[in-house]
Structures are given as C-alpha cells and as structure tokens.
C-alpha cells in the first residue's frame, strides 16, 4: 500500500468494488479483498472479447485441455505438466512450458516458410487469433485431482504482418478439413506433450482419447448473457468429443460428462468444511470426504493455484483503415477492455492510518460490502472507521476522474519504487561479491 495515497476502492459500472493500491496475495478464498474482486474482474472482459469477435464475423470454439491422473498425483505437479512452471527469481527456477503451450508452438502449428506445403500452418488455415482460458479443478477421494483448462478459441481471422506487428484484416469461415486437422493435432499432441513434461504420465488407451476436446461453437447470434454463463444457442453444437454424448436440439448448458462418482468441483469444498465444522453430520453435508480430508485438499489447492485466474492471450490488432473505428476500451487494438479505462462510477479513498485500523479489526470484507452496490454507503464506512478507533476525516469520496488520476499516480509510484529496489539489490549484490586479486 502507498502510505501517501492509502487505499482506493473504485466502484465499476456493474456495482463491483475494486481495490486499487493494494499488494494482493491472490488467495481468493482466504483473503476478503481478493475474493471480493476476482469473480467480477474477468466476466466483462470475456464477454466483450467474444461478442465483439463474433459480431465482426469471426468464430469461437469451446475447448477443454485435460490430462489423465491418479489419486497419487499432486495437484502442483499436474498443473505444472498442463500449464508449465512459473519463473521464480528467488529460487532460480526458470519458466518451463507445459502441454498447453506446446500445442500452440512448432512448425505444424505455426507453419514453415521453407516448405511450400506448410507455409501458414494449422494456425493460418483456421485463422487463429488467440484464446481466453481459465483453469478448473475437480477432486475426489478415489480419482484424486483433475485440473483442466477451459478455453474459448477465436478463429476465422485474416491477418497480415508478423508477431507484434500482426493486424486483423478481415474474417472468413474455416474449412471443415482445416478444423478437423486442428482438432486431430491437438488430440494427438496433448498426451504426448504431457508425457514429456511428466515422466510418470501414461497416455489413456483408445485412438480418440483426447488431450484436448472440442466443444460447442459460439455463433454471432450468441448473446452477452449466454457467453457469460457458458450457454449456447439451442441446437448449435458444431463439434463434440466422440466419447461424449451428443447434445440434441434444444440443449442449453453443457454439463461435464463422464465425471467419476464422488468427483466434485474443488470450490465446493469450503461449504462442506463449514457444514462439518458447524456440526452437520457427514452424510447430510453436501459433497464428500471427512473434515480432515477436506482441509488437507483445500490447503493443497489454495497453495497450488495462488494468483491463478482467467487469461486473455494477446490478440492481433485490427488493420487501420479510413472506415474502421476503434472499439471503445480496446488495448492496443485488442477486443478486450483496458482495465485502466474501465468506466468507474465513483470511488472512495481510505488513508493509510484508517486502513491499518480496519485491517487490524478484520473489517476488510465489511469495507467491500459498503462500497459495492448501487451507491457507496459513506455512513457505513464512517461507522467502520470509527469502530477501528479512527476518524471519518480519513475517508474521501472520489469522482471517476479522480479515481483514474490517483490510480495512474499509484502505477507511476510503483514503477519508480521497483526501479529503486532493483538498483538497491544490484548494489548489495556487488558489495557482497568477494574481491578478486
């Protein structure tokens, strides 16, 4: 937290409270600040990105990246194999790509300019421009952990330029042959890349057992609410895994098929823990597993996914033209709203001293509840600050412009402090080096 600016709580157009100026831990189920804003953050971005692309004439497919697992596998190992390892400067750990990253690299995918038969690769033949992805984790006493990635893959785009200079020039309908080639490659490559990442991995039996499964196709007629909830237009399922039941006409939401008995979304675990700790008998509480089992699983999950969330991969910008209007809120031309341009209704500034008092009395969540909604409850905030032994004078209502200006100043201050810290660490390292003669 910046001691000069304190903490800023901004209220979005949807009424959600967003904390600015706080170093967040990313533990969305143990931290009231992170839990309050994480669910609301990606929904607007995902909806706008997908609907904008469909309205331009592009195509979107729902794809699931999954991996075989056993009860003996640790969640962190499975997620590293699927998503890759994170870089850690303190431990010297380097970033290592996982099975997901390897699916979108290589000559077969990206093309080979030296070969006339594969100049553009699968990526060019389907018009791939990017994807939006999020990780879901299920767990069971028998089958153990099962992390998998749900992705919305955006295809059907014509582009020009290379890498950072790539621009979207139009849209087209990918051929059935190109889509089949893409699907087959991801099915074949998934198990193989997982095996390379995790020596103990054993590919599933069966020629059609997937490392990636194609799901429903979203169409230009898909509404914003449908995209947000994952529902598709009835009867418009385009491609589906052969090992799963085909939804018939009128199918709405697509439930995961083939989940083993006793396997549930790990996010249901806290509810069962609360019931069991409150005295509800095991057979009556929702979910499964003993209290000790649930606590152990939740601790492992919370550690393994700290800071994880939805990812929007970089998308090419539209090509400039006299009749092309930039979509409001785009960042570098991407059909994703810039968070710094988010339309804030208003906000409130809480000075350093008052915020420390609120945190000391565990009133973080109460502050979020007072900010979010149709309007900021300054009376409730004032009472909270006074209950923490501080003055109401440490609160200030902010206009949308003031929120943006303060946030920009916070970012500049953070960048400046990071530079100073890097210089300080470099100087300390130089002093610690032994003198050589």
UniProtKB/Swiss-Prot annotation:
Disulfide bonds: none annotated. GO terms for biological process: response to antibiotic. The keyword NADP does not apply. The keyword Repressor does not apply. Residues 161-285, 305-338 are annotated as: Disordered. Residues 203-229 have a biased composition (Low complexity). Residues 324-338 have a biased composition (Basic residues). Keywords: Antibiotic resistance, Plasmid. Belongs to the Gram-positive plasmids replication protein type 1 family. This is Neomycin resistance protein. It comes from Streptomyces cyanogenus.
């Amino acid at each position: 937290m910046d001691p000069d600016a304190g903490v800023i709580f901004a209220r979005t157009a949807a009424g959600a409270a967003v904390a600015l100026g706080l170093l967040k831990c990313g533990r969305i189920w143990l931290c009231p600040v992170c839990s309050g804003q994480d669910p609301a953050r990606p929904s607007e971005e995902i909806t706008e990105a997908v609907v904008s692309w469909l309205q331009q004439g592009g195509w979107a497919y729902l794809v699931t990246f999954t991996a075989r697992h056993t009860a003996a596998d640790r969640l962190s190992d499975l997620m590293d194999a699927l998503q890759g390892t994170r870089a850690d400067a303190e431990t010297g750990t380097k970033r290592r790509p996982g099975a997901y990253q390897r699916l979108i690299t290589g000559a077969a995918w990206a093309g080979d300019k030296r070969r006339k038969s594969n100049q553009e690769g699968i990526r060019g033949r389907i018009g791939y421009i990017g994807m939006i992805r999020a990780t879901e984790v299920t767990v069971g006493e028998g089958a153990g952990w099962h992390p998998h990635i749900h992705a919305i893959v955006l295809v059907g785009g014509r582009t020009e330029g290379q890498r950072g200079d790539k621009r979207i020039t139009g849209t087209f309908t990918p051929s059935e042959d190109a889509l089949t080639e893409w699907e087959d490659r991801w099915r074949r490559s998934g198990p193989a890349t997982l095996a390379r990442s995790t020596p103990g991995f054993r590919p599933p039996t069966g020629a059609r057992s997937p490392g990636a499964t194609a799901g429903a196709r979203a169409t230009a007629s898909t509404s914003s609410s449908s995209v947000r909830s994952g529902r598709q237009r009835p009867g418009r399922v385009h491609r589906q895994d052969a090992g799963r039941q085909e939804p018939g006409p009128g199918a709405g939401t697509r439930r995961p098929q083939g989940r083993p008995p006793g396997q549930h979304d790990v996010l249901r675990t806290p509810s069962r823990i609360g019931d069991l700790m409150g005295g509800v008998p095991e057979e009556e509480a929702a979910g499964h597993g003993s209290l000790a089992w649930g606590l152990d699983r939740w601790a492992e999950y919370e550690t393994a996914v700290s800071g994880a969330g939805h990812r929007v991969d970089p998308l090419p910008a539209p090509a400039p033209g006299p009749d092309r209007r930039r979509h409001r809120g785009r960042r570098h031309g991407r059909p994703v709203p810039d968070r710094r341009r988010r339309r804030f209704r208003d906000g409130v500034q809480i000075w350093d001293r008052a915020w420390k008092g609120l945190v000391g009395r565990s009133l973080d969540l109460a502050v979020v509840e007072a900010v979010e909604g149709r309007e900021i409850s300054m009376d409730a905030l004032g009472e909270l600050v006074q209950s923490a032994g501080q003055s109401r004078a440490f609160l200030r209502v902010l206009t949308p412009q003031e929120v943006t200006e303060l946030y920009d100043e916070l970012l500049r201050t953070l960048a400046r402090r990071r530079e100073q810290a890097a210089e300080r660490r470099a100087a300390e390292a130089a002093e610690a080096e032994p003198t050589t003669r």
